[in-house]
Amino acid sequence: QKNANFESIKTVEHKYNLIDNEEDAQRLYDYLFTKQILSLDTETTSTHAVDAELVGLSFAVEEKEAFYVAIPSNREEALKFVNIFKPLYENPEIMKVGQNIKYDYEVLMNYGVEIQGKMFDTMIAHYLIQPELYHNMDYLAEVYLHYQTVHIEDLIGPKGKNQKSMRDLAPSEVYEYAAEDADITLRLKNVLEPKLKELNLEELFWNVEMPLVPVLAHMEMNGVCIDTNSLKETSVNLTNRLTEIERHIYELAGESFNIASPRQVGEILFGKMKIVDKPKKTKTGQYVTSEEVLQQLRSKSPIIDEILNYRGLKKLLSTYVDSLPKLINPRTGRIHASFNQAITSTGRLSSSDPNLQNIPVRDDDGKEIRRCFIPEPGCLFFSADYSQIELRIMAHLSEDPNMTEAFREGNDIHAATAAKIWHEDISQVTDAQRKKAKTANFGIIYGITTFGLAQRMNIENKEAKQIIEDYFHTFPGVKAYMEKSKEIVRKKGYAETLFHRRRYLPDINSHNGTVRGFAERNAINAPIQGSEADIIKVAMVRIFKRFKAEDIKSKMIIQVHDELNFSVYPEEKEKVEQIVVEEMQNAYQLNVPLVADAGWGNNWLEAH
Protein backbone atom coordinates (compact mmCIF):
# COMPACT_ATOMS: atom_id res chain seq x y z
CA GLN A 1 0.00 0.00 0.00
CA LYS A 2 1.25 3.49 -0.80
CA ASN A 3 1.14 5.58 2.35
CA ALA A 4 1.06 9.35 1.90
CA ASN A 5 2.91 9.88 5.19
CA PHE A 6 5.86 7.70 4.23
CA GLU A 7 8.99 9.19 2.78
CA SER A 8 10.30 7.69 -0.45
CA ILE A 9 13.00 8.15 -3.06
CA LYS A 10 10.75 10.81 -4.61
CA THR A 11 10.49 12.94 -1.45
CA VAL A 12 13.90 12.55 0.21
CA GLU A 13 17.00 14.31 -1.02
CA HIS A 14 19.63 11.73 -1.88
CA LYS A 15 22.86 11.36 -3.79
CA TYR A 16 22.83 8.07 -5.69
CA ASN A 17 25.58 7.63 -8.28
CA LEU A 18 25.86 5.27 -11.25
CA ILE A 19 29.35 4.01 -12.06
CA ASP A 20 29.89 2.18 -15.34
CA ASN A 21 33.61 2.38 -16.16
CA GLU A 22 36.76 0.98 -14.56
CA GLU A 23 38.32 4.38 -13.94
CA ASP A 24 35.39 5.63 -11.84
CA ALA A 25 35.18 2.23 -10.14
CA GLN A 26 38.83 2.54 -9.08
CA ARG A 27 38.17 6.05 -7.77
CA LEU A 28 35.17 4.78 -5.77
CA TYR A 29 37.28 1.96 -4.34
CA ASP A 30 39.91 4.46 -3.12
CA TYR A 31 37.16 6.47 -1.38
CA LEU A 32 35.44 3.47 0.22
CA PHE A 33 38.67 1.89 1.42
CA THR A 34 39.20 4.74 3.89
CA LYS A 35 35.90 4.01 5.68
CA GLN A 36 35.28 1.78 8.70
CA ILE A 37 31.76 0.67 7.85
CA LEU A 38 30.50 -0.38 4.43
CA SER A 39 26.90 -1.18 3.55
CA LEU A 40 26.71 -3.48 0.53
CA ASP A 41 24.21 -5.14 -1.77
CA THR A 42 24.37 -7.13 -5.01
CA GLU A 43 22.00 -7.13 -7.97
CA THR A 44 21.94 -10.47 -9.78
CA THR A 45 20.12 -12.62 -12.31
CA SER A 46 18.72 -15.18 -9.84
CA THR A 47 17.50 -15.54 -6.26
CA HIS A 48 19.48 -18.82 -6.13
CA ALA A 49 23.02 -17.78 -5.27
CA VAL A 50 24.58 -20.93 -6.78
CA ASP A 51 23.46 -19.86 -10.25
CA ALA A 52 23.37 -16.10 -9.78
CA GLU A 53 25.42 -13.85 -12.04
CA LEU A 54 26.28 -10.33 -10.93
CA VAL A 55 24.49 -7.43 -12.59
CA GLY A 56 25.72 -4.74 -10.21
CA LEU A 57 27.32 -3.89 -6.86
CA SER A 58 25.88 -1.28 -4.48
CA PHE A 59 27.72 0.51 -1.69
CA ALA A 60 26.82 3.09 0.97
CA VAL A 61 28.95 4.58 3.72
CA GLU A 62 26.90 7.69 4.62
CA GLU A 63 23.13 7.88 4.97
CA LYS A 64 21.38 9.08 1.80
CA GLU A 65 24.53 8.71 -0.29
CA ALA A 66 25.12 5.51 -2.28
CA PHE A 67 26.85 4.12 -5.36
CA TYR A 68 25.87 1.53 -7.94
CA VAL A 69 28.55 -0.14 -10.04
CA ALA A 70 27.11 -1.71 -13.21
CA ILE A 71 28.76 -5.07 -13.98
CA PRO A 72 29.12 -6.26 -17.62
CA SER A 73 27.53 -9.60 -18.54
CA ASN A 74 30.76 -11.07 -19.95
CA ARG A 75 32.41 -12.97 -17.08
CA GLU A 76 35.97 -11.83 -17.85
CA GLU A 77 34.87 -8.20 -18.00
CA ALA A 78 32.80 -8.70 -14.83
CA LEU A 79 35.82 -10.07 -12.95
CA LYS A 80 37.81 -6.92 -13.80
CA PHE A 81 35.24 -4.84 -11.91
CA VAL A 82 34.84 -7.32 -9.05
CA ASN A 83 38.61 -7.53 -8.58
CA ILE A 84 38.81 -3.75 -8.16
CA PHE A 85 36.63 -4.12 -5.05
CA LYS A 86 37.98 -7.50 -3.87
CA PRO A 87 40.48 -5.99 -1.36
CA LEU A 88 37.61 -3.92 0.06
CA TYR A 89 35.36 -6.94 0.63
CA GLU A 90 38.27 -8.93 2.03
CA ASN A 91 39.60 -6.23 4.37
CA PRO A 92 39.01 -7.58 7.90
CA GLU A 93 39.17 -4.05 9.38
CA ILE A 94 36.04 -2.81 7.57
CA MET A 95 32.64 -3.82 8.93
CA LYS A 96 30.22 -5.05 6.25
CA VAL A 97 26.51 -4.28 6.59
CA GLY A 98 23.89 -6.14 4.57
CA GLN A 99 20.28 -7.28 4.49
CA ASN A 100 20.40 -11.09 4.25
CA ILE A 101 24.16 -10.75 3.77
CA LYS A 102 24.60 -14.52 3.38
CA TYR A 103 23.20 -14.16 -0.15
CA ASP A 104 25.74 -11.48 -1.13
CA TYR A 105 28.49 -13.52 0.54
CA GLU A 106 27.57 -16.51 -1.67
CA VAL A 107 27.24 -14.55 -4.90
CA LEU A 108 30.68 -13.03 -4.35
CA MET A 109 32.08 -16.53 -3.68
CA ASN A 110 31.15 -17.28 -7.32
CA TYR A 111 33.62 -14.56 -8.28
CA GLY A 112 36.47 -15.68 -6.05
CA VAL A 113 35.75 -13.17 -3.28
CA GLU A 114 35.21 -14.05 0.36
CA ILE A 115 33.88 -11.29 2.61
CA GLN A 116 36.10 -10.81 5.68
CA GLY A 117 35.66 -8.76 8.83
CA LYS A 118 32.72 -8.18 11.14
CA MET A 119 29.33 -8.42 9.47
CA PHE A 120 26.06 -6.80 10.50
CA ASP A 121 22.93 -8.33 8.96
CA THR A 122 19.85 -6.15 9.44
CA MET A 123 17.53 -9.11 8.77
CA ILE A 124 19.12 -11.21 11.52
CA ALA A 125 19.29 -8.25 13.91
CA HIS A 126 15.55 -7.76 13.54
CA TYR A 127 14.95 -11.51 13.88
CA LEU A 128 16.54 -11.37 17.34
CA ILE A 129 14.63 -8.21 18.29
CA GLN A 130 11.21 -9.40 17.03
CA PRO A 131 11.41 -13.11 16.08
CA GLU A 132 7.77 -13.49 15.03
CA LEU A 133 7.47 -10.51 12.67
CA TYR A 134 8.56 -9.98 9.06
CA HIS A 135 12.25 -9.24 8.50
CA ASN A 136 12.30 -8.19 4.83
CA MET A 137 13.74 -4.79 3.99
CA ASP A 138 10.59 -3.22 2.59
CA TYR A 139 8.77 -3.99 5.85
CA LEU A 140 11.65 -2.86 8.10
CA ALA A 141 11.98 0.42 6.17
CA GLU A 142 8.29 1.18 6.70
CA VAL A 143 8.31 0.31 10.41
CA TYR A 144 11.62 1.84 11.49
CA LEU A 145 12.25 4.59 8.93
CA HIS A 146 8.67 5.39 7.79
CA TYR A 147 10.05 5.00 4.30
CA GLN A 148 8.51 3.37 1.26
CA THR A 149 11.22 1.61 -0.77
CA VAL A 150 11.12 1.02 -4.52
CA HIS A 151 9.84 -2.56 -4.81
CA ILE A 152 11.65 -4.87 -7.19
CA GLU A 153 8.33 -5.78 -8.88
CA ASP A 154 8.04 -2.16 -10.02
CA LEU A 155 11.18 -2.75 -12.07
CA ILE A 156 10.99 -6.32 -13.35
CA GLY A 157 7.28 -7.04 -13.03
CA PRO A 158 5.37 -9.49 -10.82
CA LYS A 159 6.66 -13.02 -10.14
CA GLY A 160 5.90 -15.46 -12.92
CA LYS A 161 7.21 -16.58 -16.26
CA ASN A 162 7.05 -13.09 -17.76
CA GLN A 163 9.13 -11.51 -15.00
CA LYS A 164 12.17 -9.79 -16.45
CA SER A 165 15.72 -10.29 -15.19
CA MET A 166 17.71 -7.39 -13.74
CA ARG A 167 20.05 -8.06 -16.66
CA ASP A 168 17.32 -6.98 -19.13
CA LEU A 169 17.20 -3.43 -17.77
CA ALA A 170 19.59 -0.59 -18.57
CA PRO A 171 21.84 0.40 -15.61
CA SER A 172 20.23 3.85 -15.75
CA GLU A 173 16.87 2.21 -14.90
CA VAL A 174 18.30 0.07 -12.10
CA TYR A 175 20.80 2.23 -10.27
CA GLU A 176 18.43 4.29 -8.10
CA TYR A 177 16.63 1.17 -6.84
CA ALA A 178 19.90 -0.68 -6.22
CA ALA A 179 21.67 2.22 -4.51
CA GLU A 180 18.60 2.74 -2.32
CA ASP A 181 18.98 -0.84 -1.02
CA ALA A 182 22.49 -0.17 0.30
CA ASP A 183 21.44 3.19 1.75
CA ILE A 184 18.33 1.87 3.53
CA THR A 185 20.30 -1.10 4.89
CA LEU A 186 22.82 1.30 6.43
CA ARG A 187 20.04 3.43 7.91
CA LEU A 188 18.37 0.33 9.36
CA LYS A 189 21.64 -0.78 10.94
CA ASN A 190 21.88 2.58 12.71
CA VAL A 191 18.39 2.08 14.16
CA LEU A 192 18.63 -1.64 15.01
CA GLU A 193 22.11 -1.74 16.55
CA PRO A 194 21.15 0.26 19.69
CA LYS A 195 18.07 -1.98 20.08
CA LEU A 196 20.28 -5.10 20.25
CA LYS A 197 22.22 -3.47 23.08
CA GLU A 198 19.07 -2.39 24.89
CA LEU A 199 17.65 -5.94 24.81
CA ASN A 200 20.91 -7.63 25.87
CA LEU A 201 21.18 -9.43 22.51
CA GLU A 202 24.66 -8.25 21.52
CA GLU A 203 26.50 -11.39 22.58
CA LEU A 204 24.04 -13.66 20.74
CA PHE A 205 24.23 -11.46 17.64
CA TRP A 206 28.01 -10.92 17.45
CA ASN A 207 29.26 -14.25 18.83
CA VAL A 208 26.65 -16.72 17.57
CA GLU A 209 24.44 -15.54 14.71
CA MET A 210 26.82 -13.40 12.66
CA PRO A 211 29.78 -15.84 12.72
CA LEU A 212 27.31 -18.54 11.60
CA VAL A 213 26.65 -16.74 8.29
CA PRO A 214 29.87 -17.88 6.53
CA VAL A 215 29.35 -21.42 7.89
CA LEU A 216 25.90 -21.64 6.30
CA ALA A 217 27.10 -19.93 3.11
CA HIS A 218 29.75 -22.60 2.61
CA MET A 219 27.26 -25.40 3.37
CA GLU A 220 24.75 -24.04 0.85
CA MET A 221 27.28 -23.41 -1.90
CA ASN A 222 28.94 -26.77 -1.40
CA GLY A 223 25.64 -28.66 -1.59
CA VAL A 224 25.02 -32.36 -0.99
CA CYS A 225 25.53 -35.29 -3.35
CA ILE A 226 22.51 -37.49 -4.04
CA ASP A 227 22.57 -41.16 -5.00
CA THR A 228 20.06 -41.03 -7.85
CA ASN A 229 20.09 -44.81 -8.41
CA SER A 230 19.20 -45.44 -4.80
CA LEU A 231 16.45 -42.83 -5.13
CA LYS A 232 15.01 -44.58 -8.21
CA GLU A 233 15.04 -47.88 -6.33
CA THR A 234 13.24 -46.30 -3.37
CA SER A 235 10.71 -44.81 -5.77
CA VAL A 236 9.95 -48.21 -7.34
CA ASN A 237 9.72 -49.92 -3.93
CA LEU A 238 7.40 -47.31 -2.45
CA THR A 239 5.19 -47.25 -5.55
CA ASN A 240 4.83 -51.04 -5.37
CA ARG A 241 4.01 -50.82 -1.67
CA LEU A 242 1.37 -48.19 -2.39
CA THR A 243 -0.29 -50.44 -4.97
CA GLU A 244 -0.35 -53.29 -2.45
CA ILE A 245 -1.81 -51.14 0.33
CA GLU A 246 -4.37 -49.77 -2.12
CA ARG A 247 -5.48 -53.29 -3.01
CA HIS A 248 -5.78 -54.23 0.65
CA ILE A 249 -7.83 -51.11 1.42
CA TYR A 250 -10.26 -51.89 -1.42
CA GLU A 251 -10.57 -55.43 -0.09
CA LEU A 252 -11.38 -54.22 3.42
CA ALA A 253 -13.82 -51.63 2.08
CA GLY A 254 -15.47 -54.04 -0.33
CA GLU A 255 -15.09 -51.59 -3.20
CA SER A 256 -12.56 -49.31 -4.86
CA PHE A 257 -12.58 -45.54 -4.27
CA ASN A 258 -10.18 -42.59 -4.34
CA ILE A 259 -8.07 -42.92 -1.19
CA ALA A 260 -6.58 -39.48 -1.81
CA SER A 261 -10.02 -37.89 -1.46
CA PRO A 262 -10.94 -37.13 2.17
CA ARG A 263 -14.61 -36.97 1.15
CA GLN A 264 -14.63 -40.50 -0.31
CA VAL A 265 -12.61 -41.87 2.63
CA GLY A 266 -15.21 -40.39 4.99
CA GLU A 267 -18.09 -41.92 3.07
CA ILE A 268 -16.49 -45.37 3.14
CA LEU A 269 -15.43 -45.31 6.81
CA PHE A 270 -18.42 -43.59 8.35
CA GLY A 271 -21.17 -43.84 5.73
CA LYS A 272 -20.67 -47.42 4.58
CA MET A 273 -18.61 -49.20 7.26
CA LYS A 274 -20.08 -47.18 10.16
CA ILE A 275 -16.87 -47.44 12.18
CA VAL A 276 -18.25 -45.08 14.87
CA ASP A 277 -21.77 -44.13 15.89
CA LYS A 278 -21.41 -40.36 15.80
CA PRO A 279 -18.66 -39.33 13.38
CA LYS A 280 -17.41 -35.73 13.35
CA LYS A 281 -18.58 -33.60 10.43
CA THR A 282 -17.45 -30.31 8.94
CA LYS A 283 -19.77 -27.30 8.53
CA THR A 284 -20.56 -28.48 5.00
CA GLY A 285 -21.65 -31.88 6.31
CA GLN A 286 -18.57 -33.76 5.13
CA TYR A 287 -17.04 -36.40 7.43
CA VAL A 288 -13.76 -35.36 9.09
CA THR A 289 -10.91 -37.76 8.21
CA SER A 290 -7.92 -35.78 9.44
CA GLU A 291 -4.81 -37.52 10.74
CA GLU A 292 -5.85 -36.61 14.30
CA VAL A 293 -9.31 -38.16 13.98
CA LEU A 294 -8.04 -41.33 12.30
CA GLN A 295 -5.23 -41.80 14.86
CA GLN A 296 -7.87 -41.93 17.61
CA LEU A 297 -9.88 -44.59 15.75
CA ARG A 298 -7.01 -46.92 14.89
CA SER A 299 -8.25 -49.72 17.11
CA LYS A 300 -11.68 -49.73 15.42
CA SER A 301 -10.66 -51.34 12.12
CA PRO A 302 -7.49 -52.45 10.30
CA ILE A 303 -8.48 -50.24 7.35
CA ILE A 304 -7.57 -47.11 9.30
CA ASP A 305 -3.93 -48.07 9.78
CA GLU A 306 -3.74 -48.86 6.09
CA ILE A 307 -5.20 -45.47 5.12
CA LEU A 308 -2.72 -43.72 7.42
CA ASN A 309 0.14 -45.75 5.90
CA TYR A 310 -1.08 -44.91 2.42
CA ARG A 311 -1.13 -41.20 3.18
CA GLY A 312 2.32 -41.31 4.79
CA LEU A 313 3.89 -43.11 1.82
CA LYS A 314 2.18 -40.83 -0.67
CA LYS A 315 3.56 -37.77 1.12
CA LEU A 316 7.04 -39.30 1.25
CA LEU A 317 6.92 -39.96 -2.48
CA SER A 318 5.74 -36.51 -3.48
CA THR A 319 7.78 -34.50 -0.95
CA TYR A 320 11.10 -36.28 -1.28
CA VAL A 321 11.43 -39.26 -3.61
CA ASP A 322 9.92 -37.60 -6.66
CA SER A 323 11.02 -34.03 -5.92
CA LEU A 324 14.67 -34.55 -4.90
CA PRO A 325 15.87 -35.35 -8.46
CA LYS A 326 14.25 -32.10 -9.66
CA LEU A 327 16.27 -30.15 -7.09
CA ILE A 328 19.63 -31.43 -8.35
CA ASN A 329 21.53 -28.51 -9.85
CA PRO A 330 22.50 -29.41 -13.44
CA ARG A 331 25.80 -27.51 -13.19
CA THR A 332 27.03 -28.91 -9.85
CA GLY A 333 25.16 -32.23 -9.84
CA ARG A 334 24.14 -31.63 -6.22
CA ILE A 335 21.23 -30.31 -4.24
CA HIS A 336 21.76 -26.95 -2.58
CA ALA A 337 19.28 -26.55 0.27
CA SER A 338 18.80 -23.14 1.85
CA PHE A 339 19.44 -22.96 5.58
CA ASN A 340 17.21 -20.19 6.89
CA GLN A 341 18.47 -18.28 9.88
CA ALA A 342 15.55 -15.93 10.45
CA ILE A 343 12.40 -18.05 10.27
CA THR A 344 11.56 -20.15 13.34
CA SER A 345 10.24 -18.54 16.50
CA THR A 346 12.52 -20.66 18.72
CA GLY A 347 15.92 -19.91 17.15
CA ARG A 348 16.33 -23.22 15.34
CA LEU A 349 17.49 -23.19 11.74
CA SER A 350 15.03 -24.28 9.10
CA SER A 351 15.84 -25.54 5.63
CA SER A 352 14.06 -25.43 2.30
CA ASP A 353 14.37 -26.91 -1.21
CA PRO A 354 14.50 -29.59 0.20
CA ASN A 355 13.37 -29.32 3.80
CA LEU A 356 15.97 -31.61 5.38
CA GLN A 357 14.52 -31.06 8.86
CA ASN A 358 11.31 -32.87 8.04
CA ILE A 359 12.58 -36.18 6.70
CA PRO A 360 10.78 -38.71 8.90
CA VAL A 361 13.24 -40.69 10.99
CA ARG A 362 10.91 -42.80 13.06
CA ASP A 363 9.66 -45.13 10.35
CA ASP A 364 11.65 -47.39 8.07
CA ASP A 365 10.30 -45.81 4.89
CA GLY A 366 11.39 -42.34 5.96
CA LYS A 367 14.81 -43.68 6.84
CA GLU A 368 15.22 -44.93 3.27
CA ILE A 369 15.27 -41.30 2.10
CA ARG A 370 18.45 -40.77 4.14
CA ARG A 371 20.15 -43.57 2.26
CA CYS A 372 20.10 -41.34 -0.84
CA PHE A 373 22.26 -38.62 0.74
CA ILE A 374 25.89 -39.49 0.12
CA PRO A 375 29.30 -37.89 0.70
CA GLU A 376 31.52 -36.49 -2.05
CA PRO A 377 33.29 -39.06 -4.27
CA GLY A 378 35.97 -40.90 -2.31
CA CYS A 379 34.67 -39.56 1.01
CA LEU A 380 32.87 -40.99 4.03
CA PHE A 381 29.64 -39.76 5.58
CA PHE A 382 30.04 -38.67 9.21
CA SER A 383 27.14 -37.85 11.51
CA ALA A 384 27.35 -36.49 15.06
CA ASP A 385 24.37 -35.70 17.23
CA TYR A 386 23.74 -34.55 20.76
CA SER A 387 22.52 -37.24 23.10
CA GLN A 388 19.29 -36.11 24.80
CA ILE A 389 20.34 -32.49 24.76
CA GLU A 390 16.86 -31.20 25.60
CA LEU A 391 16.68 -33.24 28.81
CA ARG A 392 20.23 -32.19 29.70
CA ILE A 393 19.24 -28.55 29.28
CA MET A 394 16.18 -29.26 31.44
CA ALA A 395 18.46 -30.75 34.12
CA HIS A 396 20.64 -27.63 33.91
CA LEU A 397 17.78 -25.12 34.03
CA SER A 398 15.75 -26.92 36.70
CA GLU A 399 18.75 -28.02 38.78
CA ASP A 400 16.69 -31.09 39.69
CA PRO A 401 18.94 -33.30 41.86
CA ASN A 402 17.66 -36.66 40.55
CA MET A 403 17.88 -35.74 36.88
CA THR A 404 21.27 -34.08 37.35
CA GLU A 405 22.60 -37.14 39.16
CA ALA A 406 21.41 -39.53 36.44
CA PHE A 407 23.24 -37.53 33.75
CA ARG A 408 26.38 -37.03 35.83
CA GLU A 409 26.64 -40.74 36.49
CA GLY A 410 26.25 -41.45 32.79
CA ASN A 411 23.12 -43.55 33.32
CA ASP A 412 20.60 -44.18 30.54
CA ILE A 413 18.21 -41.36 31.46
CA HIS A 414 15.04 -43.19 30.38
CA ALA A 415 15.93 -46.33 32.31
CA ALA A 416 16.88 -44.19 35.31
CA THR A 417 13.54 -42.37 35.08
CA ALA A 418 11.66 -45.68 34.89
CA ALA A 419 13.59 -47.03 37.88
CA LYS A 420 12.66 -43.97 39.94
CA ILE A 421 8.98 -43.89 38.90
CA TRP A 422 8.35 -47.60 39.49
CA HIS A 423 10.80 -47.95 42.41
CA GLU A 424 12.80 -50.64 40.66
CA ASP A 425 16.52 -51.20 40.51
CA ILE A 426 17.78 -49.80 37.20
CA SER A 427 18.91 -53.30 36.17
CA GLN A 428 15.35 -54.63 36.58
CA VAL A 429 13.66 -52.06 34.32
CA THR A 430 11.77 -53.68 31.43
CA ASP A 431 11.76 -52.41 27.83
CA ALA A 432 8.10 -51.51 28.17
CA GLN A 433 8.80 -49.45 31.29
CA ARG A 434 11.72 -47.70 29.61
CA LYS A 435 9.55 -46.87 26.61
CA LYS A 436 6.88 -45.35 28.86
CA ALA A 437 9.51 -43.37 30.76
CA LYS A 438 10.92 -42.07 27.47
CA THR A 439 7.49 -40.90 26.34
CA ALA A 440 7.00 -39.28 29.75
CA ASN A 441 10.42 -37.58 29.67
CA PHE A 442 9.83 -35.91 26.34
CA GLY A 443 6.09 -35.38 26.75
CA ILE A 444 6.02 -33.96 30.23
CA ILE A 445 8.77 -31.39 29.74
CA TYR A 446 6.69 -29.99 26.91
CA GLY A 447 3.60 -29.75 29.06
CA ILE A 448 1.70 -32.77 27.74
CA THR A 449 -1.76 -33.29 29.26
CA THR A 450 -3.00 -36.46 30.97
CA PHE A 451 -5.19 -37.12 27.94
CA GLY A 452 -2.28 -36.53 25.54
CA LEU A 453 0.00 -38.90 27.44
CA ALA A 454 -2.70 -41.58 27.65
CA GLN A 455 -3.18 -41.42 23.90
CA ARG A 456 0.51 -41.48 23.11
CA MET A 457 1.13 -44.46 25.39
CA ASN A 458 -2.11 -46.19 24.52
CA ILE A 459 -3.12 -46.44 28.19
CA GLU A 460 -6.08 -45.38 30.35
CA ASN A 461 -6.31 -41.77 31.55
CA LYS A 462 -6.08 -42.98 35.14
CA GLU A 463 -2.71 -44.64 34.56
CA ALA A 464 -1.40 -41.61 32.66
CA LYS A 465 -2.42 -39.32 35.52
CA GLN A 466 -0.55 -41.57 37.95
CA ILE A 467 2.58 -41.57 35.77
CA ILE A 468 2.61 -37.76 35.62
CA GLU A 469 2.19 -37.55 39.40
CA ASP A 470 4.98 -40.07 39.97
CA TYR A 471 7.16 -38.21 37.47
CA PHE A 472 6.85 -34.90 39.30
CA HIS A 473 7.37 -36.68 42.60
CA THR A 474 10.60 -38.12 41.16
CA PHE A 475 11.76 -34.83 39.63
CA PRO A 476 10.39 -32.07 41.87
CA GLY A 477 12.87 -29.59 40.37
CA VAL A 478 11.31 -30.07 36.94
CA LYS A 479 7.85 -29.29 38.26
CA ALA A 480 9.19 -26.17 40.00
CA TYR A 481 11.02 -25.07 36.86
CA MET A 482 7.86 -25.44 34.76
CA GLU A 483 5.85 -23.29 37.16
CA LYS A 484 8.65 -20.72 37.40
CA SER A 485 8.97 -20.52 33.58
CA LYS A 486 5.29 -19.69 33.23
CA GLU A 487 5.52 -17.13 36.03
CA ILE A 488 8.50 -15.37 34.40
CA VAL A 489 6.70 -15.11 31.06
CA ARG A 490 3.54 -13.80 32.73
CA LYS A 491 5.64 -11.04 34.30
CA LYS A 492 8.08 -10.23 31.47
CA GLY A 493 6.02 -11.17 28.42
CA TYR A 494 8.83 -13.27 26.96
CA ALA A 495 10.88 -16.43 27.56
CA GLU A 496 14.68 -16.40 27.33
CA THR A 497 17.35 -18.94 26.36
CA LEU A 498 20.78 -19.42 27.95
CA PHE A 499 22.10 -16.91 25.39
CA HIS A 500 19.28 -14.39 26.05
CA ARG A 501 17.40 -15.15 22.83
CA ARG A 502 13.82 -13.99 23.36
CA ARG A 503 10.49 -15.45 22.44
CA TYR A 504 7.54 -13.17 23.09
CA LEU A 505 4.42 -14.95 24.36
CA PRO A 506 1.70 -12.32 24.88
CA ASP A 507 -1.00 -15.03 24.82
CA ILE A 508 0.07 -16.29 28.24
CA ASN A 509 -2.45 -13.89 29.79
CA SER A 510 -5.24 -14.75 27.35
CA HIS A 511 -8.72 -15.47 28.70
CA ASN A 512 -9.09 -18.33 26.25
CA GLY A 513 -7.85 -21.51 27.95
CA THR A 514 -6.63 -23.22 24.77
CA VAL A 515 -4.70 -20.17 23.60
CA ARG A 516 -3.25 -19.65 27.08
CA GLY A 517 -2.27 -23.32 27.36
CA PHE A 518 -0.36 -23.13 24.11
CA ALA A 519 1.60 -20.10 25.36
CA GLU A 520 2.29 -21.83 28.69
CA ARG A 521 3.73 -24.85 26.93
CA ASN A 522 5.92 -22.54 24.86
CA ALA A 523 7.08 -20.77 28.03
CA ILE A 524 8.51 -24.12 29.16
CA ASN A 525 9.66 -25.23 25.71
CA ALA A 526 11.23 -22.04 24.30
CA PRO A 527 14.18 -21.82 26.73
CA ILE A 528 14.94 -25.51 26.13
CA GLN A 529 14.58 -25.68 22.36
CA GLY A 530 16.07 -22.22 21.94
CA SER A 531 19.10 -23.01 24.10
CA GLU A 532 19.62 -26.22 22.12
CA ALA A 533 19.61 -24.12 18.94
CA ASP A 534 22.08 -21.61 20.43
CA ILE A 535 24.44 -24.38 21.56
CA ILE A 536 24.58 -26.22 18.22
CA LYS A 537 25.14 -22.90 16.40
CA VAL A 538 28.13 -22.20 18.66
CA ALA A 539 29.45 -25.71 17.93
CA MET A 540 29.07 -25.14 14.17
CA VAL A 541 30.99 -21.86 14.30
CA ARG A 542 33.81 -23.41 16.32
CA ILE A 543 34.08 -26.51 14.12
CA PHE A 544 34.18 -24.33 10.99
CA LYS A 545 36.95 -22.18 12.48
CA ARG A 546 38.99 -25.21 13.53
CA PHE A 547 38.63 -26.87 10.12
CA LYS A 548 40.02 -23.65 8.63
CA ALA A 549 42.80 -23.25 11.18
CA GLU A 550 43.90 -26.90 10.93
CA ASP A 551 43.58 -27.01 7.15
CA ILE A 552 40.88 -29.71 7.11
CA LYS A 553 39.47 -30.31 3.61
CA SER A 554 36.40 -32.26 4.81
CA LYS A 555 33.16 -30.31 4.92
CA MET A 556 30.08 -29.77 7.06
CA ILE A 557 27.12 -30.41 4.74
CA ILE A 558 23.84 -30.75 6.69
CA GLN A 559 22.46 -29.54 10.02
CA VAL A 560 19.25 -30.96 11.47
CA HIS A 561 18.29 -29.58 14.91
CA ASP A 562 20.68 -31.52 17.14
CA GLU A 563 22.83 -33.28 14.54
CA LEU A 564 25.67 -32.23 12.23
CA ASN A 565 26.65 -34.13 9.10
CA PHE A 566 29.93 -34.10 7.21
CA SER A 567 31.55 -35.35 4.03
CA VAL A 568 34.98 -36.54 5.17
CA TYR A 569 38.20 -37.56 3.42
CA PRO A 570 39.30 -40.97 4.77
CA GLU A 571 42.74 -39.66 5.76
CA GLU A 572 41.07 -36.99 7.96
CA LYS A 573 38.69 -39.44 9.67
CA GLU A 574 40.20 -39.46 13.19
CA LYS A 575 40.99 -35.76 13.18
CA VAL A 576 37.48 -34.75 12.08
CA GLU A 577 35.77 -36.95 14.67
CA GLN A 578 38.01 -35.57 17.40
CA ILE A 579 37.38 -31.91 16.44
CA VAL A 580 33.62 -32.32 15.97
CA VAL A 581 32.94 -34.26 19.17
CA GLU A 582 35.22 -31.97 21.19
CA GLU A 583 33.63 -28.76 19.94
CA MET A 584 30.08 -30.09 20.27
CA GLN A 585 30.68 -31.23 23.85
CA ASN A 586 32.41 -28.00 24.87
CA ALA A 587 30.08 -25.54 23.16
CA TYR A 588 28.52 -24.62 26.52
CA GLN A 589 29.23 -25.59 30.13
CA LEU A 590 26.00 -27.06 31.47
CA ASN A 591 25.95 -28.43 35.01
CA VAL A 592 25.65 -31.89 33.43
CA PRO A 593 27.88 -33.24 30.63
CA LEU A 594 26.98 -32.48 27.01
CA VAL A 595 27.45 -35.71 25.08
CA ALA A 596 27.77 -36.09 21.30
CA ASP A 597 27.42 -39.51 19.62
CA ALA A 598 29.23 -40.09 16.34
CA GLY A 599 28.70 -42.53 13.47
CA TRP A 600 30.30 -43.31 10.09
CA GLY A 601 29.00 -44.81 6.88
CA ASN A 602 28.68 -44.55 3.11
CA ASN A 603 25.49 -42.51 3.37
CA TRP A 604 23.40 -40.56 5.88
CA LEU A 605 21.37 -43.60 6.96
CA GLU A 606 24.41 -45.76 7.68
CA ALA A 607 26.18 -42.99 9.57
CA HIS A 608 23.26 -41.94 11.73
Which positions does each model-derived feature cover?
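C-terminal structured "cap/appendage" subdomains that terminate the fold
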Residues: 543-597
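Conserved catalytic core of nucleic-acid polymerases
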Residues: 164-167, 214, 221, 329-332, ...
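Conserved beta-strand -> loop -> alpha-helix junction used to position metal-binding or nucleic-acid-contacting
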Residues: 114-130, 144, 410-414
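Hydrophobic, well-ordered secondary-structure elements that form the walls
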Residues: 97, 261, 347, 385, ...
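Conserved "right-hand" nucleotidyltransferase catalytic core of DNA-directed polymerases
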Residues: 1-73, 90, 99-101, 132, ...
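A short alpha->loop->secondary-structure connector
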Residues: 109-119, 133-138, 400-404
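Short, basic/hydrophobic alpha-helical segments
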Residues: 77-93
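Conserved catalytic alpha/beta cores of large enzymes that bind or transform nucleotide phosphates
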Residues: 91-99, 108, 370-394, 405-438
